[in-house]
Structure formats: C-alpha cells, structure tokens
Amino acid sequence: MRSVGNVDLTIGLVTVPVKMVGVSESHDRKASMYHPHEDGNFGKIKMPKLCEDCGEVVPTADIAKGFEEGGDIVILTADELASIAAATGAALEVPQFVKAEQINPMLFANENIYRLVPDPKRGRQAATTYLMVRHILVSQELVGVVQYTRWGRNRLGVLDVEPSDDGGVLVIRNMMWADELRSTEGIVPTNVTEDDIDPRLLPVMASVVESMTGDWDPTAYTDRYTEQLSEAITAKAQGDEIATVASESGKAIDDVSDLLAKLEASIQKKAPAKKATARRKKTA
C-alpha cells in the first residue's frame, strides 16, 4: 500500500499515529496527444508553460504561486505557504462526533477517501488505540468530524469505519465546506406538485422499482466505456477499422398513456441485454 503521508489522529488528548493510504486506483485509459508525421512516426505533444505577458516558455524553477486580491496579484513563497499549512495543523483533529445521518450526503459529492493504517513503528499501543477508536465508532454508531491541513488546503472530513472481514478499517472521507455546496434553489419544479401526479402511475412506478430491487453487488457493474475503449484500441492496433455509431437519445413522452405503457413495459424488462462492441473488421 502506497502511503500518502504519516499523520497523528487526535481525539481530545488521545493520539493515534497512522498512515494515510488511498483506497482506489483508476482503471481509465488515458489518452495523450500526438503529432502524426508523414513517415508514420508520432511525436508526443508536451505543453509548454507560456507566460501570457511576454510569450516566453518559463522554467518550472521560475514559476511562483500567486493569488488575485482586489485586482492585484499577491505572490506567496514556498516557505510562506508551508508556514500557513503548519499554523493550521497537519494532524487529523477530531473536535466532535455526530450521527452519520445528520450530515448531508451531497457534501461527499467530490470526496476523496483515505484509509488509516496504524503506524507499525509506533508499537502495540498505537494498534490497540486504533482498535479502541474503531470500537467506539461502531458501538455508538457515530462518525468523527475531522479537520486537517494537507496539500496546501485546510480540509473537512469524517472519521468513519469501512466494513471489512477483520472488523473494519478507519477511513477519512473528505467533505466539501458548506459554502462550496451549491444551492438547490430553482431546481425543483414549482409549477406542479405531487398532487398533480396521475394516480394510475404511482402503483405502476412502484412495481417497476420493486422489480428492479435486489441486494447490492458491486461486482455486477463494470465500466463499459473503458472495456469498449480497450477493445477498440486493441482492434485498431491489429489493423481493424472502428465503426462509428450514432448516440441514441430517449424518445420524449407525449402523455400519461404513453408513460403508463412505458412503465408497464419496464416491469417485463428487468435485465437489459448487454450491447455488443461497435466495431467491424477492416475490409480489403
């Protein structure tokens, strides 16, 4: 496991030395930009760091971090930025415990999650304290509110327990700050209410949902885009031609009868067939 840093988890006067490790790795196929040459070679495109004022390419060593303030540019040195981070504290400080359901789940929309691993260099006490914190969170059904500074930003998160075969792993789930979550004003229609829903539709919709309800199995879902992208890359590398397919947009629902028919048809169609990869062999 690759650690992103060693840090102290502090709860009151209790300190648990831990390592923060990422929980995921991307399986996306990332494209790079190339310049095709007539001789069949490809030159990788590199982005120069251009100064928009003088137009010159600027070496990384000559680049400073600045912030706009009242129409001016304020430059902060690396030492100044480091001192700000140090002043706000790098420890995972837990000032409060709350019930998980009290937190708006939308605050986790852009979350990063880090697992906390007891630092093996700090002995048995670190490990037993780790287990004690885990026990309290699980037994009292609480999460800890966490505030810490990392990578040049003060961050808010929750200390939670990820279920696992060995009793659970402590995790930090980053949250947005309250003022970073956009308002819901203007999203929900105000020209109609639930009283305007046709009474024939609700029981049929409920049946559709019931027919699609089951136990959660994350392995049942795969990244179809990445799978087909990989197949297309392999096919083209072998000389096959990739057929282009126009995207399909859903047909508009004209009236209640049309919607009712679609809902009833949905009950009969519980498991849609997997689409075949859109490609064909290159013809001579």
UniProtKB/Swiss-Prot annotation:
Alphabetically ordered keywords of this record: DNA end degradation evasion by virus, DNA-binding, Host-virus interaction, Inhibition of host innate immune response by virus, Viral genome circularization, Viral immunoevasion, Virus entry into host cell
GO biological-process terms attached to the record: double-strand break repair via nonhomologous end joining; symbiont entry into host cell; symbiont-mediated evasion of DNA end degradation by host; symbiont-mediated suppression of host innate immune response; viral genome circularization
Domain Ku: 10-189
InterPro entries, alphabetized: Ku70/Ku80_beta-barrel_dom, Prok_Ku, SPOC-like_C_dom_sf
DNA-binding recorded as keyword: yes
Transmembrane residue ranges: none
Short name of any one Pfam family annotated for the protein: Ku
Record GO terms (molecular function): double-stranded DNA binding
Origin: domain of life: Viruses
Disulphide-bridged cysteine pairs: none
Primary role: Required for replication of viruses with short cos ends (4 bases). Stimulates dsDNA end-joining by host LigD. Binds dsDNA with either blunt, 5'- or 3-overhangs, protecting it from host exonuclease degradation.
Known partners and oligomeric status: Homodimer. Interacts with host LigD.
Name of this chain's protein: Protein Ku
Biological source species: Mycobacterium phage Corndog
Gene: 87
